[in-house]
Amino acid sequence: MLYNLLYPLSSDITVFNVFRYITFRSAWALATALLVSIVVGPRFIAWLQRLKCRQFIHEDVTCHMSKAGTPTMGGLLIGFAVTFSVLLWADLRNPYIWLTLLVFTGFGFIGFLDDYTKLRRRNNKGLTASAKFLWQVGVAVAAMYLLVQLPAYSTKLAFPFFKGLTPDLGWLYIPFAVAVMVGSSNGVNLTDGLDGLAIGPTIVAGIVFSIFIYVAGHSQIAGYLQVPYVPGVGEVAVFCGALVGAGLGFLWFNAYPAQVFMGDVGSLSLGGTLGFLAVLCKQELLLLVVGGLFVVETLSVILQVGYFKFSGGKRIFRMAPLHHHFELQGIPESKIIIRFWITSALLGLIALSVLKLR
């Protein structure tokens, strides 16, 4: 909004020329979302407590019983901070901004329904898996249908580490991208089991994709680094800045011991958005590296369930997702969280190295 209001005046007031720089607005989007989260956070948490929006703990995770009653649906705080900051600092004429907000709010709405169902039933049973999946696919298909209508966007798939290997998937690109978004959404959701565990890697991924998106939207840099050029997509770096800022602000209250949990309204929206960011900058396959922690957590659940069925009741892990396995081994929660954050940061650095390793 500020860009649309003030930048046109830059010919008369030269200081407003600074608004044309995406890096400037991304930095301020980060700062704004962070400040909004920290300022609004205490009152928001108190509001959740008054509404009795409290976390119900799965009975199998006995070591978490002390967390019962902690306010949940903190993802609404993230959603407010991100949306406010993006509307303030982004170029609102850019279609990629509105599509990203559509995905962010769409997946967030699914998470809200899931959380609300749990609160009404007063247990941790929300939407059925099939209902949640269908909602996720619906939002992802709608977003992808609108995205491929944009003339500047292509259905080519880029392969990391390989120059010029960009096959055009045609109509097959839509189901592929939908799978990326839905898988990412569920991956973050499964990882959100310890205080600050999911938001840390999400912040790392937000930083990494802000760089990839800025590069993809800059013709000269994209050409030099030989990454797919997507005209206009660089503006989404402002959204990434807001996402990182809101994530840091939420971590202020979600760090161990957590004062609030993000709930599915947070994890589903963040995961779906990370998947969409990967799609926007044509780094869908690289999401496996950037979000490697989410991939491992998801695979641990798939392997556990599959092995349990085919082995007649045996298990690979003491409990899935993987972070619960480490908990049952006696590793302190705070140590698990920090180690996962470190792993996520290393994966982020590996992903960024792809910019030169071609």
Curated annotation (Swiss-Prot):
S-S pairs: none
Biological-process GO terms, alphabetical: cell division; cell wall organization; peptidoglycan biosynthetic process; regulation of cell shape
Membrane topology: Multi-pass membrane protein
Pathway membership: Cell wall biogenesis; peptidoglycan biosynthesis
EC number(s) on file: 2.7.8.13
InterPro entries xrefs: Glycosyl_transferase_4, PNAcMuramoyl-5peptid_Trfase, PNAcMuramoyl-5peptid_Trfase_CS
TM annotation in the entry: 28-48, 72-92, 96-116, 133-153, 164-184, 196-216, 233-253, 260-280, 285-305, 335-355
CDD domains, per the entry: GT_MraY
Assigned protein family: Belongs to the glycosyltransferase 4 family. MraY subfamily.
Protein's job: Catalyzes the initial step of the lipid cycle reactions in the biosynthesis of the cell wall peptidoglycan: transfers peptidoglycan precursor phospho-MurNAc-pentapeptide from UDP-MurNAc-pentapeptide onto the lipid carrier undecaprenyl phosphate, yielding undecaprenyl-pyrophosphoryl-MurNAc-pentapeptide, known as lipid I.
Protein name (Swiss-Prot/TrEMBL): Phospho-N-acetylmuramoyl-pentapeptide-transferase
Organism expressing this protein natively: Nitratidesulfovibrio vulgaris (strain ATCC 29579 / DSM 644 / CCUG 34227 / NCIMB 8303 / VKM B-1760 / Hildenborough)
Gene (UniProt): mraY
